[in-house]
Amino acid sequence: MNQVARGAGAKRYADAKAALAGVVADGQTLAVGGFGLCGIPEALIAALRDSAVSGLTVISNNAGVDGFGLGQLLATRQIRKMISSYVGENKEFERQYLAGELELEFNPQGTLAERLRAGGAGIPAFYTATGYGTIVAYGKETREFDGKHYVLETALQADVALIKAWRADTAGNLVFRKTARNFNPACAMAGRVCIAEVEEIVELGAIDPDQVHLPGIYIDRLVLNATPEKRIEQRTVRQGDK
């Protein structure tokens, strides 16, 4: 158990600011769950913005949108480097990268997920055929197995993981809700310290063990956000009859 954990009944913190206190610092690497705006730790990201920590390297599928999610940290210039898969939804992300103001390490989406999973499992590196012969493979070791070419990808680990779940018990056992699970479990396992933002906290034993998606051994701190905004990333409506 990480040194910041205080026991099963003491993982809950009063708010996101308190949950981050003594854990986040300048220059750290963070793994942040979410896919677009789905399953992002909204309150923790906002508290991180208010903390004014800077020089961060952030591992996340994307960087939210302008003014919401991780986009807030781009606007305040708290992020030095992104390790991610998708840029297009955030204009400030795109602008900073093209202007040379933000370092960016592109990853195919599946490769990013596997690098996080490997980091959590203690696997230092793995071979994948994805990206061979493209700019993704530049500067990386390649090998041929059974007539097929592969790229060596290294595992990802983070100083702190910030994740979002639907329900937790007081020991930190988590249940995710549908597609909001996405990168969250992998981020949690890859983080040396993991802080989970949840919509409901119940007593130990209230969650059927067979329904636990992520065991509490991976969770160091919990914070309740019972009414997240859950902003819709792309609203699409049916065209009316002409």
Swiss-Prot record:
> Which keywords does the record carry?
Lipopolysaccharide biosynthesis, Transferase
Which terms under GO biological process does the entry name?
lipopolysaccharide biosynthetic process
Named from the GO MF annotations, one term is: succinyl-CoA:3-oxo-acid CoA-transferase activity
The source's domain of life comes to Bacteria
SUPFAM superfamilies assigned to the protein according to its UniProt record, in alphabetical order:
NagB/RpiA/CoA transferase-like
Catalytic reaction annotation: a 3-oxo acid + succinyl-CoA = a 3-oxoacyl-CoA + succinate
| Oligomer status and interactors | Heterodimer of a subunit A and a subunit B.
Protein name as it appears in the record:
Succinyl-CoA:3-ketoacid coenzyme A transferase subunit A
- Give the species: Xanthomonas campestris pv. campestris (strain ATCC 33913 / DSM 3586 / NCPPB 528 / LMG 568 / P 25)
Task: State the organism's lineage.
Answer: Bacteria, Pseudomonadati, Pseudomonadota, Gammaproteobacteria, Lysobacterales
